[in-house]
Design a protein with these regions (language model features):
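Short glycine-rich anion-binding loops that position phosphate/pyrophosphate groups of nucleotides
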Residues: 12-14, 54, 75, 105-108
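Conserved alpha/beta core of the MobA/IspD/sugar-nucleotide pyrophosphorylase nucleotidyltransferase superfamily
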Residues: 2, 6, 150, 154-194
Length: 194
């Protein structure tokens, strides 16, 4: 099977939190470093981190890790521009990628095991989309097979993965990720997980 890469979206300005959540410490490392390390452990290749606000600090925090940083100057436009930026970078590094996982950086319980399970579902289910299920919804991370790269590259505004999951429900396999409901947007969220 062709390689599966990952795009980790880390461009936001964490407006509700008031400081870069990408750099919050959880389990002895930053949230972003945790997700990067789990992606590397799962043998996802390449690992592309999309930055925007706080680009310099985020780049510095990942020094020494074998990742590619893709800066999105249009980060304030929403998630779609980050996905497009990451996909362009990923395909320049791995033109024959069979799939890409789009991940956010504020789900502290993401694991290499979850990433591996998504890749396995992609390989065995016959489906080209693999989404995580939690709290009665489908959400991130989401794996997109290469047949969806063209559609991904046309996303705009605040559109993210959910748009495609709704448009192509017959092509979606799911992986349970109950901890996916837990993400960090506020100080209260952070206190709850510590």
């Amino acid at each position: 099977m062709d390689k599966t890469g990952v795009i980790i979206l880390a461009a936001g300005d964490s407006s509700r939190l008031g400081r870069p959540k990408q750099l919050l410490t959880f389990g002895g490392k930053t949230l972003l470093a945790h997700i990067v390390d789990e992606a590397l452990e799962a043998s996802l290749d390449p690992v592309v981190v999309v930055t925007g606000a706080y680009a310099a600090a985020i780049g510095e925090s990942l020094k020494g890790r074998p990742v590619t940083i893709a800066h999105n100057p249009r980060w304030a436009e929403g998630m779609a521009s980050g996905i497009v930026t990451g996909l362009i970078e990923l395909l320049s590094l791995q033109p024959s990628a069979g799939g890409v996982i789009v991940s956010v950086c504020d789900q502290p319980y993401l694991s290499a095991g979850l990433f591996r399970e998504m890749v396995q579902q992609f390989g065995t289910s016959g489906k080209s989309l693999v989404a995580c299920s939690y709290g009665g919804i489908l959400g991130t991370p989401v794996l997109f097979g290469s047949r969806y790269f063209g559609v991904l590259s046309t996303l705009s505004g605040t559109q993210g993965a959910k748009k495609l999951l709704k448009e192509y429900p017959q092509d979606v396999a799911t992986v349970p990720f109950p901890e996916g409901e837990i993400d960090i947007d506020t100080e209260e969220d952070l206190k709850r997980i510590k």
